A protein has these predicted regions:
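His/Asp/Glu-rich metal-coordinating catalytic cores
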Residues: 2-81, 86-298, 316-330, 349-353
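A glycine- and charged-residue-rich anion-binding loop/surface
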Residues: 4, 27, 51-55, 76-77, ...
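Structured loops at beta-to-helix junctions and adjacent beta-edge loops in soluble globular domains
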Residues: 24, 40, 162, 205-207, ...
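Conserved hydrophobic residues forming the short capping helix/wall of the S-adenosyl-L-methionine
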Residues: 119, 413, 545
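Short Gly/Ser/Thr- and Asp/Glu-enriched loop/turn motifs at secondary-structure junctions
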Residues: 132, 427, 551-555
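Broad gene-expression machinery/nucleic-acid interaction feature
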Residues: 141, 156-158, 302, 474-478, ...
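Hard-cation-handling environments
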Residues: 210-346, 350-506, 510, 514-526, ...
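C-terminal tails and terminal domains of large nucleic-acid-associated
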Residues: 526-562
């Protein structure tokens, strides 16, 4: 098994006739999925998604893949192939097209509709090529064939990429639900045909590689929702991903059966369900869905609110309801709230905070830990083994997962018969070459997190995030002192103030004489340089704070010369 080498060098030139694969996101964390394929000087991008920040990235809105390795080669990009419409696969498209808006987008009808809605907000009109399962498109030197896969969003596709270097299958996100609500199963027959042809490299979804067995059918959620609706005596609020059309369909069906009207809440929910309805992916009986304004006039027992916010996002519709900040909806006793989604890693604290706030407001909260209101959209180990046995790849590159998922998937590959030295575990920015049927890591281009903070893209770095974490954890202390520019002696102050540290206005009285004493010693030693004096103030305050409070705030010393 090829493992991570921390001393990787810059990659050599791609050998003639070889295929280069560069993952720019999606490895080591679930999100920012983006993979670049290179053949004969041309590039093909598969997916271009975002990662959502966690508590270690305060103030950050989104995290993008690092486009740096391809920014000076955008003219070589033949297309961006999008496997499906989840944000971790399409969310970064507007940021990449901001550099070159005419890069063709290739995807299914629903996927492209979601992307085009995002691009319209930025006044970008893309060149879009709609494909279907069973279709083939030649994109420069890349011959792409598309296969239906079942996932937690309609119209998901896998893509087989053929070049003279070999056949590569990229599954995208998938599972093997044998009874999907839309009747669209993962194309195992097509994958078996590829296996007969000879899959030289398989890139496959690793999210649930640690989980044994097979996925629970989506159909099992319907009866659970029916039971919840039958028992609820007041208003029902269901929170789900804004792209989970199948779950919304189940909610609509249950609402109709129990004589309730449905209102969509949240901008992305309203937009996406409108797109799904227009494309015939969402069946809405006449009169079932109403506007939120009308819903607020009906008795609670006659309405269902279909909302965003299943991941505890504070500014989502459900998040604002939980905190009492929603303009139209106030949580009240008798409400039943259903969180019909999985927990995305890193969101646990936020989700349980929302659950507790809803419970405090009097709502009964039902989530996946207490009822089967959600099933995963990703293949567990049994289905991954099935895929491996059907496709029989010569080389395996696990993608889409944290390190534990990638390694679990790698073990499955070896168990299924892939040679250990043909299983390639990579990290973002690695360079993998497929040459003469063998895939191997040949170097590293590097890849960093690109943070979106408001309108700023890439301006926030790790050092700034460290400062924000220090501010959040320890607060801020400012120490100002005036010194003689010649002797360095204190002639004014010190004054010490703080934010987020203590409410006691006299808390810093003990440190003031310590600063004066330290600067006095410095003056006797002939130290008058303001920068050196600032460091003395910083160290003095820091030692005192550590001794007195065992805290590490941000300390900003200011030395003024007169």
């Amino acid at each position: 098994m090829t493992v991570i080498d921390t001393d990787k060098q810059f990659p050599p030139p791609l050998p003639e006739g070889g295929l280069r694969i560069i993952p720019l996101g999606g490895l080591g964390a679930i999100g920012r999925n983006m993979t670049v394929f290179e053949y004969a000087g041309k590039l093909l991008v598969v997916d271009c998604g975002v990662l959502f920040p966690d508590v270690e990235q305060p103030g950050v809105d989104l995290i993008l893949p690092d486009f740096g390795p391809i920014l000076d080669r955008l003219n070589d990009v033949q297309a961006i192939v999008l496997t499906h419409g989840h944000e971790d696969h399409i969310g970064a498209v507007p940021y990449l097209l901001a550099h070159k808006p005419d890069i063709p987008l290739v995807g299914s009808q629903f996927t492209l509709a979601l992307v085009e809605a995002k691009l319209a907000e930025r006044r970008i009109e893309p060149y879009a090529l709609t494909v279907r399962e069973g279709g083939r498109e030649r994109l420069g030197p890349f011959e792409c064939e598309f296969f239906a896969v079942n996932h937690s969003i309609p119209d998901a596709l896998a893509v087989a990429i053929r070049t003279p270097a070999g056949l590569v299958l990229h599954t995208g996100d998938f599972k093997m639900d044998q009874l999907p609500l839309d009747g669209r199963i993962t194309d195992l027959a097509g994958f078996a045909r590829l296996g007969g042809e000879g899959v030289d490299l398989l890139l496959s979804d690793s999210t649930n590689a640690e989980i044994p067995g097979f996925v629970t059918p989506e159909r099992e959620i319907g009866p659970v929702l029916d039971s919840i609706f039958a028992k609820a005596t007041g208003r029902i609020i269901v929170a789900s991903f804004a792209s989970h059309v199948h779950r919304v369909q189940q909610v609509l069906d249950s609402a109709g059966e129990h004589g309730r009207k449905v209102a969509f809440i949240g901008r992305s929910m309203v937009r996406n369900m409108g797109i799904a309805r227009d494309l015939g992916l969402l069946r809405i009986p006449p009169g079932l869905v109403i506007a939120l304004d009308e819903a607020t006039t009906l008795p609670p027992e006659r309405i269902v609110l279909m909302s965003t916010g299943s991941q505890g996002e504070p500014m989502s519709a459900l998040g604002r309801m939980a905190s009492g900040d929603h303009r139209h909806i106030t949580i009240a006793p008798g409400d039943t709230v259903v969180l019909a989604s999985s927990l995305v890693p890193g969101n646990e604290t936020a989700v349980y905070r929302v659950i507790n706030r809803l419970s405090r407001g009097g709502a009964t909260v039902i989530h996946k830990d207490v009822a089967k209101v959600h099933v995963s959209g990703h293949a567990p180990a049994g289905e991954l083994l099935y895929l491996l046995n059907v496709t029989r790849p010569s080389n395996l590159m696990p993608v889409h997962g944290e390190w534990r998922h990638l390694r679990a998937h790698a073990r499955l590959g070896v168990e299924s018969g892939v040679a250990p030295d043909r299983v390639v575990i990579c990290e973002d920015g690695d360079v993998v070459d497929l040459v003469e049927g063998r895939a191997s890591v040949v170097g590293r281009l590097g890849s960093r997190y690109v943070y979106v903070d408001g309108l700023a893209v890439g301006d926030v770095g790790e050092s700034l995030l460290t400062e924000r974490r220090i501010l959040g954890d320890g607060g801020f202390i400012s120490a100002t002192v005036v010194v003689d520019s010649v002797t360095g002696k204190v002639v004014g102050g010190p004054t010490v103030s703080a934010k987020g540290f203590s409410d006691d206005p006299d808390a810093f009285n003990p440190v003031i004489p310590l600063i004066t004493e330290a600067l006095g010693r410095a003056a006797l030693d002939g130290i008058a340089d303001p920068h050196q004096l600032q460091q003395i103030v910083r160290r003095t305050v820091g030692r005192w704070v550590n001794d007195a409070y065992r805290r590490r705030p941000m300390i900003v010393p200011t030395v003024v010369e007169v």
